[in-house]
């Protein structure tokens, strides 16, 4: 099969890496890709905003399945367009993607289908939102309604935080039109996990879970990011909790989509808070998480392309997913200044030495090849993944690999998976 992966992150690198291992894979393309992906796939660069460009490429290269990585292309209806032209796509329709692209749609869906989520109110008016925060108990959570690259959530410990959050989102338009509407919800106590399941027209299939570190700095300090690291498994997640997630959240979500005549084909990411009252849905994402994807795919034993092929043909029920029993830790190396302003084009050296450490696989994100060197070209730059018998050993291997890398322009968290080791 000929496969096209759309995207340029470490998530897409890990997807290409996984698909490449499949006996079913004849040729793999990635648009636009990065300096790491181009070593295992044919990378092309053309205007993805024009859907016809994607269609023409698919026809020219006889693409069997398109795998869409980033959420913005799902929001723009790339999946719908290609399917209407008889191209198979792994990734939900524009309508189904509203589970991520509109927090308001997602919260209403959860409420309609009696799936546990935090109590909430939504506002289009800055004045009404300001009046509301004067009457609530803190902490609270303020969320931009639309897509904000994983950074549109603000946890407010007091009224000053909330006023600043409202000003940034609704007045200063920090997230553009994504902040035209906001959600204000109660703060839930507990711990977060990212849970993943494949959905097709007829059934769903559990992939697994990972724990994500969203804050920029150690001890969960600093601003929210797209994710600075992840790990699996967690000593806090028992079989009982997993079953509760499947029965009270995943299945009702599948049933709700079916009831509302929304066909969902692809991976669905459940951002959950595990509280003393059980799991609550914080958010849905309609694609693989990053860095969770890198972590999960290191642990996946089943052929990913077999799963994707079955998924796009509504035959998930034919698949049995097998995961390894080892532990995986993923540490993200980001450009200094991320998630704010950062410099590009700093040279990264000694990656090949880091890759030699036992259990290590390095996935590229914001990297480019320049004058036969690897240089930084984005906020999150590398995902160092490590697989071992325990979290403790996997952590040790990951940080040993990072020490081998020579990059003065980057930073990373030193506590990924620490609480679980």
Identify what each model region corresponds to.
Residues 1-94:
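ATP-binding N-terminal substructure of ATP-dependent carboxylate-amine bond-forming enzymes
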Residues 4-5, 99-183, 211, 235-251:
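Active-site nucleotide/adenylate-binding loops and adjacent lid/helix of ATP-dependent enzymes
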Residues 38-41, 98-104, 217-219, 359:
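Short, charged, surface-exposed secondary-structure boundary motifs
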Residues 50, 367-371, 376-421:
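Generic C-terminus detector
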Residues 53, 161-164, 339-342, 389-396:
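Short, conserved charged micro-motifs
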Residues 156-293:
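Internal nucleotide-binding/catalytic subdomain
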Residues 246-269, 285-357, 370:
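Active-site "cap" helix and flanking loop/linker of ATP-utilizing ligase/carboxylase catalytic domains
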């Amino acid at each position: 099969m000929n496969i096209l992966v759309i995207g340029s992150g470490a998530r897409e690198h890990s997807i290409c890496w996984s698909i490449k291992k499949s006996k079913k894979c004849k040729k793999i393309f990635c648009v636009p890709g990065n300096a790491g992906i181009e070593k295992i796939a044919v990378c092309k660069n053309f205007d993805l905003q024009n859907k016809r460009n994607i269609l023409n490429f698919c026809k020219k290269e006889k693409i069997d399945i398109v795998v869409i990585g980033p959420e913005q292309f799902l929001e723009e209806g790339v999946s719908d367009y290609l399917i209407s032209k008889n191209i198979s796509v792994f990734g939900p329709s524009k309508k189904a993607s509203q589970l991520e692209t509109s927090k308001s749609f997602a919260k209403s869906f959860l409420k309609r289908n009696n799936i546990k989520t935090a109590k909430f109110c939504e506002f289009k008016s800055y004045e009404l939102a300001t009046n509301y925060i004067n009457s609530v108990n803190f902490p609270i959570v303020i969320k931009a309604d639309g897509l904000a690259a994983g950074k549109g959530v603000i946890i407010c410990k007091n009224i000053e935080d909330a006023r600043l959050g409202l000003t940034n989102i609704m007045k200063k338009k920090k997230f553009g039109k994504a902040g035209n509407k906001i959600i204000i919800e109660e703060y839930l106590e507990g711990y977060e996990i990212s849970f993943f399941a494949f959905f097709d027209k007829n059934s769903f299939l559990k992939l697994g879970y990972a724990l994500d570190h969203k804050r920029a700095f150690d001890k969960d300090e600093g601003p929210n990011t797209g994710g600075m690291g992840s790990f699996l498994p967690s000593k806090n997640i028992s079989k009982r909790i997993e079953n509760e997630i499947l029965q009270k959240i995943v299945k009702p979500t599948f049933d709700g989509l079916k009831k509302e005549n929304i066909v969902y084909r692809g991976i669905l990411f459940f951002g959950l808070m595990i509280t003393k009252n059980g799991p609550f849905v914080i958010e849905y994402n309609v694609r693989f998480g990053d860095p969770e994807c890198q972590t999960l795919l290191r642990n996946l034993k089943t052929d990913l392309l077999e799963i994707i092929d079955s998924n796009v043909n509504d035959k998930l029920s034919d698949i049995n997913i097998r995961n390894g029993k080892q532990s995986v830790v993923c540490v993200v190396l980001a450009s200094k200044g991320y998630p704010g302003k950062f410099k590009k084009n700093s040279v990264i050296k000694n990656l090949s030495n880091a890759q030699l450490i036992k259990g290590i696989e390095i996935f590229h994100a914001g990297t480019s090849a320049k004058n036969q060197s690897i240089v930084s070209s984005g906020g999150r730059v590398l995902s160092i993944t490590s697989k071992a018998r325990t979290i403790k050993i996997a952590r040790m291997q990951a940080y040993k690999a990072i020490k081998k890398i020579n990059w003065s322009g980057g930073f990373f968290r030193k506590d990924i998976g620490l609480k679980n080791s």
